[in-house]
A protein has these predicted regions:
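Transmembrane beta-strands of outer-membrane beta-barrel proteins
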Residues: 33-37, 70-74, 109, 125-129, ...
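Short glycine/proline- and aromatic-enriched beta-strand/turn motifs that initiate or cap beta-hairpins
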Residues: 11-72, 79-82
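Residues that define the transmembrane beta-barrel architecture of outer-membrane proteins
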Residues: 29-33, 53-59, 68, 103-109, ...
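Outer-membrane beta-barrel proteins
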Residues: 44-48, 72, 81-87, 136-142, ...
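Outer-membrane beta-barrel "beta-signal"
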Residues: 224-225, 240-252
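Outer-membrane beta-barrel pore domains and translocons
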Residues: 38-42, 75-81, 116, 130-134, ...
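Outer-membrane beta-barrel transmembrane domain signature
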Residues: 64, 69, 117-123, 130-230, ...
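Extracellular loop and loop/strand-boundary signature of outer-membrane beta-barrel proteins
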Residues: 45-51, 91-102, 149-156, 203-208, ...
């Protein structure tokens, strides 16, 4: 991972579909395809009446096309999901065998586009739009007692999606290394449905929608050219919580 000194506060979950990347497309200036693989650790706060911390680990593959000033890309990947204290009881009469919701790898897809305008040979500015959707539900269950009676219940996290729009400033330094930083806007929603409405548990009043707590964040990263068309990208994002990711791309 590139040293974190270049990663300033960026978003907590806006990277739900992976890195935003540098404002300038990674494809060759004359135009062409690129492919890549990436990993991201994502953490953010969602809320309805109360706050809920969500964590994800993602791996994905990417294919895109671009020229010097614009590019489009798509990603397909898998992600786990953890909601802290999703089963933690808030009443003495209810106890649960576990606190956190956890589920393993589910498929998601991402589409994005970007435009770039060079101000001079060193600096440039760009904008991007990126959206992700999770094709499968996350589920987990717990058991416990309520007023001495045994119960089992399951939570289902459905239709998780996010949309991000941001503006980035890029500086090209020696060895064609690109440093970039900027703000972004972010919107994410998901529905959570319990199989049983159990008093004392956080999600106990039927199906609800939760959304990201903060709609604005910042991101910062570095793009390092490697040998023979390969690039290494590392990025940090922050709004309510910190997220980080890295990717390797190849330009044809």
């Amino acid at each position: 991972m590139i040293p974190a000194v270049i990663l300033f506060a960026g978003n907590g979950t806006a990277a739900a579909g992976g890195l935003f990347g540098p404002p300038q497309p990674v494809s060759k200036e004359a135009g062409g395809l690129h492919t890549g693989i990436g990993y991201g650790y994502l953490e953010d706060q969602y809320r309805n009446d109360t706050d809920h911390t969500i964590r994800k680990n993602q791996v994905y593959s990417e294919v895109g096309y671009g020229v010097d000033h614009w590019g489009v890309y798509g990603r397909i990947g898998v992600s786990d999901l953890k909601i802290l204290d999703a089963f933690r009881s808030t009443q003495a009469s209810t106890s649960s065998s576990k606190n956190d919701l956890k589920d393993d790898w589910k498929f998601f897809g991402t589409l994005g586009g970007q435009g770039f305008y060079p101000l001079n040979r060193t600096f440039g500015i760009g904008a991007f739009l990126q959206g992700s959707y999770y094709f499968q539900d996350f589920t987990d269950g717990t058991s416990g007692t309520n007023n001495g009676a045994r119960f089992t219940t399951e939570l289902k996290v459905k239709n998780l999606w996010d949309v991000n729009f941001g503006i980035g400033i890029q500086a090209t330094v020696p060895n064609e290394i690109k440093l970039y930083v900027g703000p972004y806007l972010y919107c994410s929603r998901t529905r959570i449905a319990p199989s049983v409405n159990m008093p004392g548990l956080p999600f106990s009043s039927g199906e609800i929608t939760i959304h990201n707590k903060t709609n604005i964040g910042g991101f910062s990263g570095i793009d390092v050219p490697l040998a023979r068309g390969f690039h290494l990208v590392a990025e940090g994002q922050y709004s309510e919580r910190f997220s980080v990711g890295t990717a390797v791309t190849y330009s044809y």
